[in-house]
């Protein structure tokens, strides 16, 4: 289980690794309701959860994989953003597209909490369920977005998009891997966890 961001940075290298080292292993990537993660791991409906969980179930075993800073993105030639930096004024005034994951409690909350701490509110006009679709919207409109840095790097490489440092301090979420204690000593599970940890190392 993981977001499309995790799919984007993990699946190509993971599948290449499995093709040579474990060709009989099959992967099913799903995005279940976060409220059911503990039960799904306990019932073997899921083997692993990978992502950013602000309040993970205490019964799960956790391994931090990496910290991912946020980056702001806008289309090249944006009529307002002519400078090399993004001002706080423009950040809160320009319309945003925000990723809204299944239970609405992940990335957007972290960003909006940081903005609220300095007494401001940004203007979100579009919510989307995944990160990679954001690039097409940003590249064709005057909307801006705040996304994980590796997503932003992909946008800049593939689309007419410019990346900016955020004009305020934003938390860098901890992306981690979670699993149930029943899988802790399983040899195959340990092998897969080790491979994923190496592949996701920044």
Where are these regions (language model features)?
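Central regulatory/effector-binding core of bacterial HTH transcription factors
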Residues: 1-58, 128
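A late-sequence structural motif
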Residues: 9-10, 161-202
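Alpha-to-beta junction loops
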Residues: 25, 41-50, 70, 120, ...
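Secondary-structure junction motif
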Residues: 52, 80-82, 86, 96-118, ...
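Short secondary-structure boundary segments
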Residues: 53-54, 76, 148-151
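Beta-alpha-beta core module
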Residues: 58-64, 68, 129-181
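Flexible hinge/capping segments at coil-to-helix
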Residues: 60-96, 180, 189
């Amino acid at each position: 289980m993981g977001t499309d961001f995790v799919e984007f940075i993990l699946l190509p290298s993971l599948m290449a690794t499995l093709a040579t080292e474990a060709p009989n292993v099959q992967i099913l990537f799903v995005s279940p309701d976060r409220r059911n993660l503990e039960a799904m791991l306990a019932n073997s409906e899921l083997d692993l959860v990978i992502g950013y969980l602000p309040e993970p179930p205490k019964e799960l075993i956790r391994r931090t994989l990496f910290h991912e800073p946020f980056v702001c993105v806008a289309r090249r030639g944006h009529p307002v953003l002519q400078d090399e930096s993004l001002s706080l004024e423009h950040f809160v005034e320009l319309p945003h597209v925000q990723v809204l994951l299944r239970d609405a409690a992940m990335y957007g909350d972290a960003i909006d909490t940081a903005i609220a701490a300095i007494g401001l509110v940004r203007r979100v006009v579009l919510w989307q369920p995944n990160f990679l679709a954001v690039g097409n919207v940003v590249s064709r409109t005057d909307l801006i977005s705040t996304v994980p840095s590796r997503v932003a790097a992909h946008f800049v490489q593939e689309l007419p998009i410019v990346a900016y440092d955020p004009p305020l301090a934003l938390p860098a979420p901890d992306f981690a891997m979670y699993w149930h204690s029943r899988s802790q000593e399983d040899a195959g599970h340990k092998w897969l966890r080790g491979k994923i940890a190496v592949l996701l190392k920044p």
